[in-house]
Amino acid sequence: MRLFLIRHAHAESGEPDESRRLSPEGREQARALGKRLADEGVRPDAVLTSPLLRARQTGDALAEVLACTSEPSDALAPGASAATVQSAIEGRGETVIVIGHQPDCGQIAAELGDGTEPRFPPAGMVELHLPGPGTS
């Protein structure tokens, strides 16, 4: 499975955490990331997001460019772990995009990847290759 783990794009400040929207810069970051993925031929089977507004907006922008839909998942709310991500993506196809938060994204990438915690700026992304059913 190809898992694209993405931190939500840049969000405005000054609102309660659950209500923070993408800033104009964040909307542009999300569209640009969607275009980059499309240009690389990425065709996701699923786009899953944290239920928080800024993550949903990032997912919607990506999905619009990639001609698919995005779906919020409570399993990806702040505090998500590698185990909750694996549970959320199970059975979702061979190529899945997950949009979440920091520090969760870095910790999840380290646990599911090579143990190194990558830097995750807003709209930062890591591609991970996870074993599928019957592989190790």
Task: Give the predicted meaning of each segment.
Residues 40-43, 90-94:
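Glycine-rich phosphate-binding loop signature in dinucleotide/nucleotide-binding domains
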Residues 85-87:
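Conserved ATP-dependent adenylate/AMP-binding module captured primarily in the ANL superfamily
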Residues 3, 92-100, 104:
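Generic beta-sheet signal
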Residues 115-136:
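Domain-level recognition of soluble alpha/beta enzyme cores
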Residues 2-74, 79-82, 115-120:
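Active-site-proximal alpha-helix that buttresses catalytic centers in soluble enzyme cores
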Residues 51, 100-102, 124:
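Short secondary-structure boundary segments
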Residues 105-108, 115:
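Conserved beta-loop-beta/alpha segment of the NTase-like Rossmann-fold superfamily
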Residues 54, 104-105:
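Alpha-helix capping/helix-boundary segments
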